Each structure stands twice: as structure tokens, then as C-alpha cells.
Amino acid sequence: MLRPAGLWRLCRRPWAARVPAENLGRREVTSGVSPRGSTSPRTLNIFDRDLKRKQKNWAARQPEPTKFDYLKEEVGSRIADRVYDIPRNFPLALDLGCGRGYIAQYLNKETIGKFFQADIAENALKNSSETEIPTVSVLADEEFLPFKENTFDLVVSSLSLHWVNDLPRALEQIHYILKPDGVFIGAMFGGDTLYELRCSLQLAETEREGGFSPHISPFTAVNDLGHLLGRAGFNTLTVDTDEIQVNYPGMFELMEDLQGMGESNCAWNRKALLHRDTMLAAAAVYREMYRNEDGSVPATYQIYYMIGWKYHESQARPAERGSATVSFGELGKINNLMPPGKKSQ
């Protein structure tokens, strides 16, 4: 399992986690139904969801789709680790935006009784990885879930929710289909993902064409996730961030892999085409600003992990205000009341 193991200085941030290298060929990884009472004031329309479905279907049809699975498999394994951290079994679970089954392959039938795998791309479902868990494939949009209230004990989602147009509503639907005391464990790309590529494209396009357009999709800020989860009804929240750095021979190899992952930009306001000279200039800027000692260039993927529980009366709750029997001012006296052998040193 890849884990952070150091620091790497970045051009516009004070630090970023670095991940131990693992040889992966030419790449080196270093690092339905709407819920009742939806509170979303309006439906945003940032992404072309039909284009995203086509991109994912195209990626799943490639002769060697596993060649581009390295990042999604790594994040899927980290989601599975978080599932195993919970000491219970889950009779019925859902993987939302499952792709080719990047989470299921790391789970076992002792932990998951039955696994529903839902995705917008039919080819991804047809070519999903094998698992020992009994599975059911469901062609479904993450924005419209075709499941009843209180259905699942566990919902997981890995690197899919950053493409939904209305994240608050999607989280509300996940909460809706969870059973009481059910848990949601998710991962999505964070705002600093591919900042090297974004910066290089902006600099080159500004110089060559007198301005720039967005070429990388917008991402949610980590400060918003806790609020969105709470507003959706989740409690006992956990939100943390991680970074995975992947080294590529150059910018064009990175962009080829993004296409192979099905992660190309699908925002409505994307610019369809950049001039060849602008692309070559961006590749030169990328190499000049971020090149490693071995000549490769890094790409940073920031990952937000989130965990939220659906309320159940058996869950621990904060004590009521004013119920404490000892004030902070009296904590220093507690040491005098303890037996001599147990006093703090």
C-alpha cells in the first residue's frame, strides 16, 4: 500500500506529501429517485453529463483499459482500508460510480454480503474487475439514484462525485438510501489536483493567445465538504486530504492517461481546441517549472476522503451543555485526589 513518506517543495504551496515509488511500467506512482425533501435551491449545470458518459464508455472499450487504472485502483484500495477500519459486516452495500470495480476487488465476502455496483457507463460495468463478493450491476446516474429509502448498510464512492452537477443533492440522495446507522465512505478529487498542468496551460495560453480558458474541471474546496455532508443529514463526520504524485515522461503523456482514465474535461465552458503552438509552449513551461532530476514531470492528484453516518439512536451523542460535573478550572485539583501511585508525573 502506498503511503506518504516525505515532503516535496512546490512552486505555489508550502508543501505536499510525497509517496514511495512503485514501478508501474512507464509511470511511476510516488505517492433514479430523488430523496424526499431535497433542499437544493437550484440545479447547477456545470458538466456535460452525456459527454462524461461517452468519455467513460470510450475509456472502458480500449484494448488495455487496465493500463490506466493505477490511480483509481490506489484510491479504491484506500477506500477499502477505511471500510475495514469499521468493525462490522455490511449485508448490503453500494459502490456509486464504480467504474470497473476499483473498490470491490479489495473487499471480501466476510465484510460485504452483497455489492451493488452502479455507474453511468455501461461499458465500465461490462468490463468490471472480478471479485469474490456477489455483485449486481446497475446502470444509473449518480445524480438520480433508483433506490428506495433505507436500503443500504454501506455506500462507497471513489473518484466519481467530482463530476456531478449538484453535489449537495447527490449527498442527500446517498443519505436517503442508507439505513439508519449506515455509513458513507467517499473519495473525490480536490482543488489542487493537476495544478501543475493548469498553471502551465494558463501561462502558455495567455502568452500565445492573449488570454486563457478553463481546461481543467473545477473541483470542490475541502472547507465546503463538511458543511455539505452535515446539510445532507450526516453526522460523526470525518474529512481528510491526501496527495498522490505521479511522474510522467511529459505533459502529453499525462493528458493521454487522463483520457484513458475517462477523466478528460467535460465542463460546458471548456475550450474545444488549443493551437498546436500553444500546446507545445505549455509542455515546455511544464517541464521548465516542474521537471524532476530524472527528466520526468510530476502531476499531483489531491484526494478528499469523507466519512459520514446516518443517524441512529444507538450512536454516541455529545453531552448536553451544562451536564459536566467538573469545570476546566478544577482539573488541576484532580491530581490531588488520585492515589499516590497513579498521580501524573
Curated annotation (Swiss-Prot):
The keyword Lipoprotein does not apply. It is linked to Mitochondrial complex I deficiency, nuclear type 16: A form of mitochondrial complex I deficiency, the most common biochemical signature of mitochondrial disorders, a group of highly heterogeneous conditions characterized by defective oxidative phosphorylation, which collectively affects 1 in 5-10000 live births. Clinical disorders have variable severity, ranging from lethal neonatal disease to adult-onset neurodegenerative disorders. Keywords: Disease variant, Leigh syndrome, Membrane, Methyltransferase, Mitochondrion, Mitochondrion inner membrane, Oxidoreductase, Primary mitochondrial disease, Transferase, Transit peptide. InterPro entries: Malonyl-ACP_OMT, Methyltransf_11, SAM-dependent_MTases_sf. This is Arginine-hydroxylase NDUFAF5, mitochondrial. One of its GO terms (molecular function) is monooxygenase activity. It comes from Homo sapiens (Human). GO terms for biological process: methylation; mitochondrial respiratory chain complex I assembly. Arginine hydroxylase that mediates hydroxylation of 'Arg-111' of NDUFS7 and is involved in the assembly of mitochondrial NADH:ubiquinone oxidoreductase complex (complex I, MT-ND1) at early stages. May also have methyltransferase activity. One of its GO terms (cellular component) is matrix side of mitochondrial inner membrane. Interacts with NDUFAF8, leading to stabilize NDUFAF5. Interacts with NDUFS7. Interacts with PYURF (via TRM112 domain); the interaction is direct and stabilizes NDUFAF5 protein. The lineage of its organism: Eukaryota, Metazoa, Chordata, Craniata, Vertebrata.
